[in-house]
Each structure stands twice: as C-alpha cells, then as structure tokens.
C-alpha cells in the first residue's frame, strides 16, 4: 500500500486535494394510475456519477406524447463537472475551485390541456472553493417558467433564486446555517398564514416549522439533537404566485390546487447533507482521522404534479440535482 507523503515538519501525511463530481438531470418522469396504469420512465436522464474527471454529458429528446394525456415538444438535459484553477471576478473575488452544473429543459409542456408552458428550465450550479471547499456556493440562475398557464390563464410566478443565500461561514452545511433556516421558516410561516388553508396542509406546515426549530437548536449545539444519520430540508424557489382568476383554484405557498385536476407544486427544492460519493475510495484512504465525509446536495423540481380525477397519477420535472465532495 502506498504511503502518504510526509510534511516538512514530519507531523503527518500531506493529502492532495481532489473533488468527486456528482450531478443529475431529468426532463420528466412519473406514473399514471387511471384511466390506465403506466410507469413514465425518466426522459432524458443524464448522470455525472462519482468521478474526478472533468466531464460534459448532454441528451436531447424529441416530441413526446404519453397516452394523449401528457406531452411535450422537446427537451434536453446537461451535466458538467470542471475545475477552474484561476478565476477572479471584476471585484477581485476568487472563484478558483470545482464547478458542477446541472440543467434540464422542458418545452411545449401540456398536461390534459390544463397545465401548459412554453418552456421550463431547472438549473443548479455549485462551486466548491479551493479553501474551505467542503460546502459550496450554490446558484439557481437560469431556472424559470416561460408562459406558464392554467386553463389558458397566464400564471405570474416570482422566483427567489437567492433562497440559499451566500456560502455559510466556517464551511458549515446549509441546513446548519441560521440565515438559511430563518429564510425557509419565514417562507413556511407565510404559506401557513394563507386564508382557508386546509387542515392537512396546516399540519404539514406546522411539522416543517417545528423541524426547522430542531435544526436551529442542533446548529447551536444542543447535545440532545446531535446528528442522527443525514438531514434534509424542503423549501421552494417560489417567492409569490399572482392571482389566478379561475373558479375554485387556490394557492398555498408554492402549491396550486385545481378542481377536477389535482395539485401542482412549483420549484420544489431539497437541500441536505449525505455521504460524500467516494468513487471507490474509503474514508480511511482520504482522511486518516476516519472522520466521515459529508456532501451538501441540492435537488430542484420545477413541477411536482399530483393528479386526481379524471386522470390519476403523478409526475415531476424538469428536475436537477447537484452535489459532490472535496477531499481531504
């Protein structure tokens, strides 16, 4: 077995920094329950999986019709992993590091002639810096809805692309960052205050707010709330949804209820920490201390459909996910 190189002071091994890229993108996937039962396999799925190599993978899908119920004219996906060794912006900020980009685009989308959109883009990019590079800077710039309509009525959607904020200080995970947790809590409280909120949603929002309070106490060092496994937090890029003048249509946060159709949740985001992808390397090889290596991940789905009557089933997309791990 190869030995680690020794530092000049002889204090221990000097480990060369490296990065494992991981990203995924999918145009659309789901299932139908009635009037027929059918699995909708992921269209255009591409995966940049557990590799240290700089990589670009793309895929395009042409016109697609799923039993005359769900259709789209075209779509494409893209995942990129690359290292930028020397880069500063016009303000002199250093952006050297490892960058991962994941993109999914859906065009000419139609769900039983009720949900339509000319173009929907899901995009996430993470930048792991060379110094304190275990937690990345993240951006969702490029994500958007173009000419999104319900029953032919335009739906005005305002996105909060900065929901995650700046990279947390001290290389802390996002779900242990007080500023991020405060923003998500305010988002949930605003949705929970909606007039006429159904009891089922009220309970869900209350549970999510209580969970955030637990995350805050754990981040502040409460020994009773030490990490048990890996954690995650759901929120949304939606800042606001404009009025939809259709009888019976209601909005609750990022969720839209449509009578005789079901619900559609917009720009659903999951932020979490999980085991760093090791590409076959053990923790002992990468970190002599044996300390587990965590990886921050970000998963975004622009549409999450729950169909009721007369069509039953569900589906999501376009969707992207990005993470990766820097070692040691």
Regions found by a protein language model. Name each.
Residues 2-328:
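Extended, solvent-exposed, non-transmembrane regions
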